[in-house]
Amino acid sequence: MHDKLLIEGKLVAGKGEALAVFNPATGEQIAAIAQADLHQVDAAVLAAESAFAHWGQTTPKTRATLLLQIADAIEENAEAFARLESLNCGKPYHAALNDEVPAVADVFRFFAGAARCLSGSAAGEYLEGHTSMIRRDPVGVVASIAPWNYPLMMASWKLAPALAAGNCVVLKPAEQTPLTTFYLAHLLAEILPAGVVNIVFGRGADIGDALTGHEKVNMVSLTGSIATGAHILSHTASSVKRTHMELGGKAPVIVFDDADIDQVVDGIRSFGFYNAGQDCTAACRLYVQRAVYDKVVEALGNAVATLKMGDPHDETTELGPLITEQQLERVVGFVERAKALPHITVVTGGERVKGQGFYFQPTVLAGAKQEDEIVQKEVFGPVISITPFDDEAQVIGWANASHYGLASSVWTRDIGRAHRLAACLQYGCTWVNTHFMLVSEMPHGGQKLSGYGKDMSMYGLEDYTIVRHIMIRH
């Protein structure tokens, strides 16, 4: 098992405290891995700074060629990545292999092409005797913090655009889920020049703070909780670093009475519970028009009850465990508080699964009110709430009355209504008659407390650049 940091092109053991890494499907410890010490964090940042002097001046073609080599290496090692992601996260192996690893490779391929297509404003004479032009230059050293729900995918979302734009990166995976990142490290060591990517490991409170607060770091990119984002913003405020934040969500799913109910049920069964609901865009906050409310509640409850939980290596398993005992207890707390409300009905699920592992039953809670905690706060587990609504104005108000602003969906056969709602919803993405669909060519990112900045797409590439004006007198 790979467990080494990557610093200045070399794979080295951490010199700090050993952290336990667990298999969520069994609750058993699978490794004890030494985190970096503060000297190693400093060495990683300085290696990135040194490498940037050359890497930042390479041609897009050069960078694209190496990104394509990374994509090839990921595909060639797909089974190894899927095994580690399943072991460390509890994900069904077939989902990691068939859904996530191909998407990771595709992100590197997309940004390999995007690196060669970055455009700027037209040059021109805006002042007599002077010619102006616009450059998009790399930011410099980027500190990237990846989350535990999609360790490999989120690492790719951060590495690919940053490298394509000519930046150097110091990446820290979540302390709970480092295994695929360590495996990636040994591949990157063979492909990239020394120092272009460095990987450190450790707790956020010490290693994360040391990394993001380092004076040589020019930009911090985080996917994580609102609390973590707020902490990093406060921690880095004095150095005025550029920041890129994706901080979670509570996606409203608006179902009108003209929607295809079978399509809705099939979609929410998948999109609300993929990755055990541990997804910032999960279809978790349903608003259903009153005329079809009872029908949707019954059909969705029946469908969700058929989701199969269990062994991640069983090809029929659809739902894995939560990531840690702590996360499981958090989900239990949300559901127990919701169950205590007299107006909420547990349609299916609602309990921790007895036995080994951190499993929670896929859960549908009906009768939730707009002000309920279960409607307002991100649970990050296999739990959806359903609330009836009467008309467009009411549901738009309810959907937007949230601190989050990442993802949303509208289910209707009325194309005019779909356009009206898409124009009004305050979310970074609105899907119509689907949910949870992501492609490398389109941006992903939020507003409000869900953060700012875009992953994927040309917008994601631009986020890792600085716009500069060059004026020449002649």
Swiss-Prot record:
Q: Which GO terms describe its molecular function?
A: aminobutyraldehyde dehydrogenase (NAD+) activity; NAD binding
What EC number(s) are associated with this protein in UniProt?
A: 1.2.1.19, 1.2.1.-
Question: Which CDD domains does its entry note?
Answer: ALDH_ABALDH-YdcW (cd07092)
The broad enzyme category this protein falls into is: oxidoreductase
Write out the GO biological process terms: L-lysine catabolic process; putrescine catabolic process
Please name the InterPro entries in this protein's record.
Ald_DH/histidinol_DH, Ald_DH_C, Ald_DH_CS_GLU, Ald_DH_N, Aldehyde_DH_dom, Aminobutyraldehyde_DH, PatD
Q: Which Pfam families does the annotation name?
A: Aldedh
Q: Name the Gene3D superfamilies for this protein.
A: Aldehyde Dehydrogenase, Chain A, domain 1, Aldehyde Dehydrogenase, Chain A, domain 2
Please name the pathway: Amine and polyamine degradation; putrescine degradation; 4-aminobutanoate from 4-aminobutanal: step 1/1; Amino-acid degradation
Quote the catalytic residue positions: E246, C280 (nucleophile)
Keyword set includes Zinc-finger: no
Q: Quickly give the catalysed reaction.
A: 4-aminobutanal + NAD(+) + H2O = 4-aminobutanoate + NADH + 2 H(+); 5-aminopentanal + NAD(+) + H2O = 5-aminopentanoate + NADH + 2 H(+)
Q: Where does NAD(+) bind?
A: A146, P147, W148, K172, P173, A174, E175, D209, S225, I226, A227, T228, C280
**Alphabetical keyword list:** NAD, Oxidoreductase
| Homology family | Belongs to the aldehyde dehydrogenase family. Gamma-aminobutyraldehyde dehydrogenase subfamily.
Further remark: 4-aminobutanal can spontaneously cyclize to 1-pyrroline, and 5-aminopentanal to 1-piperideine.
Q: What does this protein do?
A: Catalyzes the oxidation 4-aminobutanal (gamma-aminobutyraldehyde) to 4-aminobutanoate (gamma-aminobutyrate or GABA). This is the second step in one of two pathways for putrescine degradation, where putrescine is converted into 4-aminobutanoate via 4-aminobutanal. Also functions as a 5-aminopentanal dehydrogenase in a a L-lysine degradation pathway to succinate that proceeds via cadaverine, glutarate and L-2-hydroxyglutarate.
Q: What is this protein called?
A: Gamma-aminobutyraldehyde dehydrogenase
